[in-house]
Every structure is written in C-alpha cells, then in structure tokens.
Curated annotation (Swiss-Prot):
<dbReference type="Pfam" id="PF14715">
    <property type="entry name" value="FixP_N"/>
</dbReference>
<feature type="topological domain" description="Cytoplasmic">
    <location>
        <begin position="1"/>
        <end position="32"/>
    </location>
</feature>
<feature type="binding site" description="axial binding residue">
    <location>
        <position position="173"/>
    </location>
    <ligand>
        <name>heme c 2</name>
    </ligand>
</feature>
<keyword id="KW-0813">Transport</keyword>
<dbReference type="GO" id="GO:0020037">
    <property type="term" value="F:heme binding"/>
</dbReference>
<keyword id="KW-0997">Cell inner membrane</keyword>
<comment type="pathway">
    <text>Energy metabolism; oxidative phosphorylation.</text>
</comment>
<feature type="binding site" description="covalent">
    <location>
        <position position="125"/>
    </location>
    <ligand>
        <name>heme c 1</name>
    </ligand>
</feature>
<keyword id="KW-0812">Transmembrane</keyword>
<keyword id="KW-0406">Ion transport</keyword>
<dbReference type="GO" id="GO:0006119">
    <property type="term" value="P:oxidative phosphorylation"/>
</dbReference>
<comment type="subunit">
    <text>Component of the cbb3-type cytochrome c oxidase at least composed of FixN, FixO, FixQ and FixP.</text>
</comment>
<keyword id="KW-0249">Electron transport</keyword>
<keyword id="KW-0472">Membrane</keyword>
<feature type="transmembrane region" description="Helical">
    <location>
        <begin position="33"/>
        <end position="53"/>
    </location>
</feature>
<protein>
    <recommendedName>
        <fullName>Cbb3-type cytochrome c oxidase subunit FixP</fullName>
    </recommendedName>
</protein>
<feature type="binding site" description="covalent">
    <location>
        <position position="122"/>
    </location>
    <ligand>
        <name>heme c 1</name>
    </ligand>
</feature>
C-alpha cells in the first residue's frame, strides 16, 4: 500500500494533509501516557455512576450500589447534635435566671447560644454587636427604656414593645404638633428646653421659662420631674447624652411634632423559652445590664 504521508521539513513530522491558505497542520499524536490516563478517567466515571448516587430521575435519583447519601449523613449528625444541645438547653430552661448566673457552665452555654440567636434575629435592627442605630436602642450602654435587669430584659424580649402581644410594653411619644396640642413656636421652645436638660446649646433668645412651663404641662407626666424618664412607661431619660432619634433641634422638633412609636417584636411563640432566656443572658452581658 502506497504511503502518501507528507513530512514537514522543519519538524520532521507528518502533516494531516489539510492546508488552509498555505498553512498546514502537523499530525502530532497525544502522548500515550495522557491517552491512557484519559481512558482511565472514563472508566472511573462510569464506576462512580454505578457505585454512588449520580443520575437524577423524575422524583428522585439513582442511589448507587453503595446506597451512600451525604444528606443522610448530615441528618444523622444534626440529630446527634440536636440531642446533645437538647439536653443542655433543657437544663438551661429548667434553671432560673439567677441560677444561670451562678452556674459557669450554664452561663457559658446561654451566652454562646444567645450570641448565635442574636445574630440571626436581632442584629438586623440592633447591629451585630448591639450598638444600635437611629430608632434602635444601643444595648451596650446602661440606658434602658424598659429596664436593664435580667428579668426586665427577658420580659422585653418575650413580649416586645407595641408588638400587639397581650403582655407587650405599651406607651408611645405623643404627636403634639400633628394632634394640635402644641403650636409650632411652642414646639421649638420646648425642644430647646429639652436640649438644655442635657447641657446641649440652645437657640439664641429662646424663652427658657416658657419652655419649662410647656414641659411641665405636657411632658412631666411621662418623662418625670426634671426629665429623668420613667421605665414603667418606656419614657427615656432626657438629661443624659443618649438619644434614640437624635438630639439636634430638627430631630427633637420632629419627635415632638410627629411622635415616636417604634415597635419591638414579641419573640414568644417564635423562639422557645430556653432560647429566649439565652438571648436575655447574652444581651445582659453586652455591658449595660444591671
């Protein structure tokens, strides 16, 4: 049989016999070791299809000869972990808050569990570290609208504030301007008076006596004499440097005119009692708990 192979004079290799615009292609076979490895991978893939789950079906998939399922393994591990956690969380749930504080193991468990739950449920409003934001209280300081003891914190988490729960904290900042209780100039005057309570500068020439009179007639009932606040009503202390909605004149005018009524959701029914207790312990440990 006649061999019509054409050799390339430079490389000494045969060409494929094809030519495009004067360009010829060398016939360079793949290395034998590479070809062997390639076929071995095909054999391995076929074996994998047979042994392990591989092909999707209409409502399931092929299970393979080994019947292996990583999902089943994960489910078993999660069940084991849940059992371990369940026993520990049951002990946490059975203990009082005072007992949790006295037991190092339960306290560590509550803080660890509380931190995780806080990150999943509370961080979107209060921040990952509980530092808060405008309209969302800072949980690291010692300024508490509804009280900062362990029991008070747990009650707030359970029932929320203005959440609609039967046991929720009620109380809101009235809209003195919107409801026509105070006129515009009166709101400006009392806003400056409120700023003066915490040592903030006031508008030049404002009538302090008039501001105090307006405050006594309209604000003392909730915020108390001197503006020290009232935790039973969720009324903030107006004499410190902590302001939930801002301390500048414009922010205070808006607050007095339009009112404030932020909502804290009730977590009872969403989280189990042990988890709520753990969250209360964690929040209390952030630095501002009393």
């Amino acid at each position: 049989m006649t061999d019509h192979s054409e050799f390339d004079s430079v490389s000494g290799k045969t060409t494929t016999g094809h030519e495009w615009d004067g360009i010829k292609e060398l016939n360079t076979p793949l290395p034998r070791w590479w070809v062997i490895c390639f076929y071995l991978t095909i054999v391995w893939a076929i074996g994998y299809w047979i042994v392990y789950p591989a092909w999707p079906l209409i409502s399931s998939n092929t299970t393979g000869l080994f019947g292996y399922s990583s999902r089943a393994d994960v489910a078993v591990e999660l069940a084991n972990l849940e059992k371990i956690r369940g026993d520990k969380m049951a002990a946490l749930g059975a203990a009082s808050l005072a007992d949790v504080e006295k037991d190092p193991a339960l306290l560590a468990l509550a803080r660890a569990k509380g931190k995780t739950v806080f990150g999943d449920n509370c961080a979107p409003c209060h921040g990952s570290g509980g530092a808060g934001a405008k309209g969302f209280p800072n949980l690291n300081d010692d300024d508490w609208l509804w009280g900062g003891t362990l029991d008070q914190i747990m009650q707030t988490i359970q029932f929320g504030a203005r959440s609609g729960h039967a046991k929720t904290h009620e109380g809101q900042m009235l809209a003195f301007g919107k409801d026509g209780v105070l006129k515009g100039d009166e709101i400006v005057t009392v806003a400056n008076y409120v700023r003066s309570l915490s040592g903030l500068p006031t508008r030049k020439g404002y009538d302090a006596a008039k501001g105090e009179k307006i405050f006594v007639e309209n604000c003392v009932a909730c915020h108390g004499d001197g503006g020290k606040g009232n935790q039973e009503m969720g009324a903030p202390n107006l004499t410190d440097k902590i302001w939930l909605y801002g301390s500048d004149e414009a922010a205070l005018i808006e607050t007095i005119s339009q009112g404030r009524a932020g909502v804290m959701p009730a977590w009872e029914g969403r989280l189990d009692p042990s988890t709520i207790k753990a969250m209360a312990v964690y929040v209390h440990s952030l630095g501002g708990g009393k």
